[in-house]
UniProtKB/Swiss-Prot annotation:
Name of the protein in its database record: Adenine phosphoribosyltransferase
One record GO biological process: adenine salvage
Cellular component GO terms, alphabetical: cytoplasm
Keyword Transferase: yes
One Pfam assignment: Pribosyltran
Amino acid sequence: MTFEDDLQASVRTIPDYPKPGVMFRDITTLLGDARAFRRAVDQLVHPWAGSKIDKVAGIEARGFILGGAVAHQVSAGFVPIRKKGKLPHQTVRMAYALEYGTDEMEMHVDAIARGERVILVDDLIATGGTAEGAVKLLRQIGADVVAACFIIDLPDLGGAAKLRAMDVPVRTLMAFEGH
């Protein structure tokens, strides 16, 4: 069994959630398995071992869990990227595309200094709308987005390709065809 097969076995798939026809990939089972969680975090950060990374930005909500662990591994600070209205201090905001409409995300305006090297982290990349918005938000405040990391890629939906087209290297640990 390969690393990817082993990791995929730790992800629960729930058919027809949140709506009919969707195969929901639930990483809470991976997070609850200490060995799988550790291996996933180690593999996410492997390309940057020994590199200077200043901050890890995690997208709400599962990106907070993974981002905190990744930040610890690379000895970097952690920055939450949240839905609009959830942060108490002055923020910078970016609109992003959803399947049906738009939403906004934000981060504290002073969370990242211009030129800091940042890795963006979330659990899954599908269409890439949220991750694209996060990259734009980070670049708006002057961050150098070194990479975007995800446990799961749904390649048929094109999100990873969208980020690569923005000159952001993308690291994923497993792919599920279809959605």
